[in-house]
From Swiss-Prot:
Domain CUB, residue spans: 52-170
SUPFAM superfamilies: Cystine-knot cytokines (SSF57501), Spermadhesin, CUB domain (SSF49854)
Result of altering R247A: Abolishes cleavage into active form
The family this protein is said to belong to: Belongs to the PDGF/VEGF growth factor family.
Keywords, sorted A to Z: Cleavage on pair of basic residues, Developmental protein, Disulfide bond, Glycoprotein, Growth factor, Mitogen, Proto-oncogene, Secreted, Signal
InterPro entries: CUB_dom (IPR000859), Cystine-knot_cytokine (IPR029034), PDGF/VEGF_dom (IPR000072), Sperma_CUB_dom_sf (IPR035914)
Signal peptide per UniProt: 1-18
Disulfide bond positions: C109-C131, C302-C360, C306-C362
Localization, UniProt: Secreted
Assembly and oligomerization: Homodimer; disulfide-linked. Interacts with PDGFRB homodimers, and with heterodimers formed by PDGFRA and PDGFRB.
Primary localization class, coarse: secreted
Record GO terms (molecular function): growth factor activity; platelet-derived growth factor receptor binding
Full protein name: Platelet-derived growth factor D
Length: 370
């Protein structure tokens, strides 16, 4: 096994992010790769995981791609591109039609994959993870002015051509128009190079809208009627067919049908409910000059969430709908009264009152969150 200096021209051509002169990288220059010492095997593949994180200020058009695109990419890579644009702008990503990574295992991209994440100050949303050769990933529009692209390859199989992602700046910062739900061919130009990509609806946005719609239904029958008014009964019967297509992993040898309506009702009924909660008595009563035994007691307090019980669940919180005070007998001790002239420390069994929540309600804001 030899330890060689990793030649600049090899990686500079392979680990690529190309942009026009207005898109400026903020990370260290790629020339720093001249001094990277990496082990190689006899097949000229990297044997140590190579990591690189690059930040790109998006002011125009450009692209990032897997090393050696459109040829086979190296093994053991973990490459990250963080794309930033000005406030009140968004970033659009379009995959080149030449796309191919190592195939998925059981429909899960475990080994080699490219992943896109939406980044905001409060959350990170995975827009998708792709591998294999079956289809080109859809066009993606960031929800904020930041988006992250990650490419990972393991130390086994590789594939070609890899991937190439064109990025561009969107200054409209408006919700996607209804016309963008149509399938059409979009041709753009970057530095004189044209590319074609299908214009498809962002699957994340479709799923969000569908999830909000599903929250309106309480039974499987109502849900299927909404999707297929003419054939919902047939769909309902087919759902429980004893075939691998309809049999879930939790089926095993169960003879009865799963009661989806009951599961849905349980989630709504018991997500926001009173439950055991341990409270510190001194903190609960706001008493600093006494101590108690036991120090803590169990009370019933509202807990859980309203995620599956309401339509606009992000604006809802689980709060007490009915609160009662209950007595508890505890041992109270006043540490300031120490033993003096035969007088014992002050200790006594006392009754204290603690709040218990008997009913919990989901309180929702009149305005859904942005």
């Amino acid at each position: 096994m030899h330890r060689l200096i990793f030649v600049y021209t090899l990686i500079c051509a392979n680990f690529c992010s190309c942009r026009d002169t207005s898109a400026t990288p903020q990370s260290a220059s790629i020339k720093a790769l001249r001094n990277a010492n990496l082990r190689r095997d006899e097949s000229n593949h990297l044997t140590d995981l190579y990591r690189r994180d690059e930040t790109i200020q998006v002011k125009g058009n450009g692209y990032v791609q897997s090393p050696r695109f459109p040829n086979s990419y190296p093994r053991n890579l973990l490459l990250t591109w963080r794309l930033h644009s000005q406030e009140n702008t968004r970033i659009q990503l379009v995959f080149d039609n030449q796309f191919g990574l190592e195939e998925a295992e059981n429909d899960i991209c475990r080994y080699d994959f490219v992943e896109v994440e939406d980044i905001s100050e409060t959350s990170t949303i995975i827009r998708g993870r792709w591998c294999g050769h079956k289809e080109v990933p859809p066009r993606i529009k960031s929800r904020t002015n930041q988006i992250k692209i990650t490419f990972k390859s393991d130390d086994y199989f590789v594939a070609k051509p890899g991937f190439k992602i064109y990025y561009s700046l969107l200054e409209d910062f408006q919700p996607a128009a209804a016309s963008e739900t149509n399938w059409e061919s979009v041709t753009s130009s970057i530095s004189g190079v044209s590319y074609n990509s299908p214009s498809v609806t962002d699957p994340t946005l479709i799923a969000d809208a569908l999830d909000k719609k599903i929250a309106e239904f309480d039974t499987v029958e109502d849900l299927l009627k909404y999707f297929n008014p003419e054939s919902w009964q047939e769909d309902l019967e087919n759902m429980y067919l004893d075939t691998p297509r309809y049999r879930g992993r939790s089926y095993h040898d169960r003879k009865s049908k799963v009661d989806l309506d009951r599961l849905n009702d349980d989630a709504k009924r018991y997500s926001c409910t009173p439950r055991n909660y341990s409270v510190n008595i001194r903190e609960e009563l706001k008493l600093a000059n006494v101590v108690f035994f036991p120090r803590c007691l169990l009370v019933q307090r509202c807990g859980g969430n309203c995620g599956c019980g309401t339509v606009n669940w992000r604006s809802c919180t689980c709060n007490s709908g009915k609160t009662v005070k209950k007595y508890h007998e505890v041992l109270q001790f006043e540490p300031g009264h120490i033993k003096r002239r035969g007088r014992a420390k002050t200790m006594a069994l006392v009754d204290i009152q603690l709040d218990h929540h008997e009913r919990c309600d989901c309180i929702c804001s009149s305005r859904p969150p942005r």
